[in-house]
Amino acid sequence: VTKRFVRTVINDQVPETFYDTIRSENRHYRLEQLKFIGDTVNEPVIANLCRREGLDVNIVGANISPMQGSMMSVFILQLIGETDAINEAEAYIDQSGAIRKRLTIDWENRTVMESA
């Protein structure tokens, strides 16, 4: 119930067209959800990711919402590259103050969910 309520306040779903696009992707990638709350909203985390050697960043979904006198941004990113480059990007995100969750795709139901 709480997840459904939060989902109505914060649109963290990927667009339907994304599933067809991602199926055709033949490069190694991971999906990540990044949440920026409060002061972390002002940090150039995604811009810095885009500058990393050997890493492509695709913004799949995004939402920015006021939340109790502050701001919250939620991005769903596709990080594309070799395993080492993606691992380094994840480490950078983790130390940046953003909240990161790795996501997986349930192809049968065409939904994105948090990885186990």
Regions found by a protein language model. Give the residues of each.
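Conserved beta-strand-loop-alpha-helix hinge in the C-terminal portion
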Residues: 1-15
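Non-catalytic connector elements of ABC transporters
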Residues: 22-116
